[in-house]
Amino acid sequence: DRSLQPEEPHGIVLMLPANTSKSRTYAHLRDNGQLGAIINASEINTMVSALSQDYGRQDDVYCAAAHHEDISSSFKVDGLPIFVREPRLGMCLTGTPDQFVALVRTLENGLYSRLGILTAPAKWVWHSAAPKEGQIENRAYFRELGGEVLGMHEMLLESPTEVVFTAAQWEEHSRRFESCLDGVVIEGCDSPGAIVVRHGLYAMRLAAVLT
């Protein structure tokens, strides 16, 4: 039957480029399944450039993936509808304050409250680029670290781990974030409330990862 077509193979792509179309992001998250994906970008502007294009407007996807909420799309170009159950997507971005403002234009679009933000002052110290005996090349160094992370990942696949908070830890968690939320209520602004609530969740996630 010539009408039958072979099924297109779907590869697993764990490292998604920051400049990826919305439809491709859907497809990658679907194909990766529980492994999920991560976006690494040394320049926030790379993602800003994609989000400013018609093909790359996917703030909603990032917001949904932060809470593993099911996402779906149906476009003629994609053929059958795409459904992604409990998408898992992480992002690690670096950039200047101006680049960050270009990415998160307002506190009310939901993306800001879903980000963990780390700021640090610049420490200007000159590091000579001259080669030194016994010096480790950066790429080789991070390749070695990558091998260690891969080993940890493979170990956890064979030995699933569940992190459980004690009653005292739950009490401390609730006390701290309830205090933060009370401060927001006093200010009379709604947007920071979402930041406090979501960061209460992220504190638990970080505790699980560090454990």
Regions found by a protein language model. Give the residues of each.
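Phosphate-sensing "switch" segment of ASCE/P-loop ATPases
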Residues: 64, 73-88, 101-211
